[in-house]
Amino acid sequence: MQKSEGSGGTQLKNRATGNYDQRTSSSTQLKHRNAVQGSKSSLSTSSPESARKLHPRPSDKLNPKTINPFGEQSRVPSAFAAIYSKGGIPCRLVHGSVKHRLQWECPPESLSFDPLLITLAEGLRETKHPYTFVSKEGFRELLLVKGAPEKAIPLLPRLIPVLKAALVHSDDEVFERGLNALVQLSVVVGPSLNDHLKHLLTSLSKRLMDKKFKEPITSALQKLEQHGGSGSLSIIKSKIPTYCSICC
């Protein structure tokens, strides 16, 4: 009877010990599994790509990201960019060690201003290279050719709205290019610009409130008066009463 009770107690102890060992083994396996998962997670976060994001390399500054040619932004180019890429503008940018220049496919004086001059004026609103340089330099050089007044004056009704779009643009550099183009045009067409001047002066008046544009706009107005003759002063004063004539 005592033997039976003793063996029964031993069995209970062994069973309890077995359950404890099983629980200990399961707990150990669970800890090991968690440790393995944790190490995998740490490996993924310490990948070269992640490390590059957390600690950018010095070479990243020398190699900035470029526009993806298949991206959404590149699928819808501006009108000027599309014309330029198709060879619709007969000049190309030549990179120099000191400064850039344009290379014309044929002498500029042999080119028709319609619609080339208007297309170049539309390009003044571009904000990316090389379109910014090609448009402003092409516009300037085209107006320097022999016979430019006769070619440019008939285009004024179509040129003025395009120049106005540049002058009302929110980008300061676009505005500056538009302002310079307006002065260049006034040198060529002279008093013929007076009939269209009032459409452009409102935007100049608004920018005149900005200190950084006060001097270049004042200088531009003086040149408009100089090349526009006596009739230009009353037009300028009607839109910008604070303007002081160069004749004063």
From Swiss-Prot:
Biased composition (Polar residues): 1-29
Modification type N-acetylmethionine: residues: M1
Region (Disordered) location: 1-71
Phosphoserine: residues carrying this PTM: S47
Keywords: Acetylation, Phosphoprotein
Keyword Phosphoprotein part of the UniProt annotation: yes
Cited SUPFAM superfamilies: ARM repeat (SSF48371)
UniProt cross-references to Pfam families, sorted A to Z: ParcG (PF10274)
UniProt KW RNA-binding keyword: no
Compositionally biased tracts (Low complexity): 39-49
InterPro entries: ARM-like, ARM-type_fold, Parkin_co-regulated_protein
PANTHER family in alphabetical order: PACRG-LIKE PROTEIN, PARKIN COREGULATED GENE PROTEIN PARK2 COREGULATED
This protein's name: PACRG-like protein
Gene this protein is translated from: PACRGL
